[in-house]
Every structure is written in structure tokens, then in C-alpha cells.
Amino acid sequence: QAMLQELGLAEEDIERLETLPYEALAEAYKKVSPAIQEKGGYVGCVPIPNEYYPGDPRVVGFTPHARTIPVLVGTVIGEMCTFGPGLPDRRTRSREDQLTYLRKFLGDKTEELVPLFEECYPGRPITDLVLLDTFSRVATKDFCRKKAEHAQSATYNYLFTFDFPIDDGTPAWHCADIPFVFHNTDKVPVCNIPGVSDQLEETMSSLFVNFARTGVPTAPGLPQWDPCVPGDLPTMLLDRECKLVHNFDDKLYEAYLPVAVNPKDLHEEEVTMLH
């Protein structure tokens, strides 16, 4: 109703929304949504709970049918936090330079967080700490753990941690795993590292196809992949070398989330991030 009013339309004209340019719809939504949200109204990008859709299973629980369906769910290391320009020379900076950079954003927490990060991601530049996904990883782990309470079907978790050959190496951003899943990295030049990305693509596309066929994510050369069970969240790290880790980043996120950096604050000048 608020959008219709903003656009100068009556309720009986609602079908005209289908004919309007996206830009007009987006501008109307941005204008009216803050006031609606402030009053407790629904603003979001998921279905409104009803008889057909009970709601987020992490909140309302899994339906009897959903408990029987195997699930493969994962995220990428950076998600929304690596859309912006990369940090120059991130792999060649001295450790002291990297620590100085981190202290600008994390202050006294730097000394606590760096060892936790290095335990999770040995060999990575420690500056990647402030690029960690704070949008999807925690919610995904919560979903997996709650789904794993139902033994009728298996739940598998992955984390795509590949570095792309752009801006001195950029950790994977939101949806960066999709070309590997669908075996079409040849159509996305930024994906390609000869002899590396093609092998990872073969592994990832194979495991998804095999999961769709059998309910178990397998691929030649991929380590044994254990499903999630109460108390244990195995996560397959998909990268140059794929490996299975268990409950590996719980302590890191517990310490980092209270001081997590807004990605926009990482850049001294304003940048436009396109998705």
C-alpha cells in the first residue's frame, strides 16, 4: 500500500507494478521501507509466513517432510565483505605492516583475534581477518546444527575459500562459487588460474551432481565428507586443496562478531559496490 501511494497508484492498479521500470520500484521501496520497519511492519526478502510457509526453520523448526530431505549448504569466505577493492600487496606485506593495518579497525582486540584467525586459516594473510563474512556463515552454521538434530536425512556444510586472481588476490565474494558449481568458469575470466581453477571446478561440479543424484557429496580426490551431527559441524573447505575441518571457526566468530568491521569502513575513499 505504501509503495502504491508513493508511486501515485490506487490499490486497484496493483497489476501496473509489473509494468514499471525496476529503478522506479527500487526508489519507491527505499523511500517507504524505513518508516514501515520503524512501526514494526514487515520489510525483508523472504516469504511472509503463512499456512504454506510456516517460517524460518531455524526459528519455527523443520516440517516433517523437510526433515527427510538431505541438504548441502554452504557459503564463501568473504560474501558481502569482499565486494570492494582489494588490499594492495596483501601477500607480500610484512607481518608488522599487517598488524598495523588490523589495529586501525580492531584496536586492542587484534592480539586476541589474530591467533584465532591463523588457527583457522594457516598461511592466509592476517589482513583477511577483517574480510570475513559476517552475513551468512553464522546463520548457515545455525541452520546445519538445527537440521542435524533430525537424523532422518544428512546435512552437509561447505565453505568456499578460493582466492581470485584480481587486486593482488581477492578472497571469494558472494556467489563466487557458482561458476565452479555449474562448470562454466571458462566464461568468467576472473575465475581462471590455469591448472588450479579447472581442477577445483571439476571437483565442485562433480560433488554437486553426485549429491543431487545420491544425497552424498562425493568427487574424485575429495576427502571423506562427514555429515553434521549434534555436537559436530564438519565443514569442507573448497580451495586449491580441499579439506574437512570440524567446528573450526566457532571461537573465531565468537570473538570477532562483537567488533566486526563494516566493509565500507575498509576504504578511505567512497567506492561503488555492484552486485
What is the role of each PLM region?
Residues 85-106, 223, 228:
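Short Gly/aromatic-enriched secondary-structure transition segments
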Residues 96, 103-118, 122:
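Glycine-centered helix-coil hinge/cap
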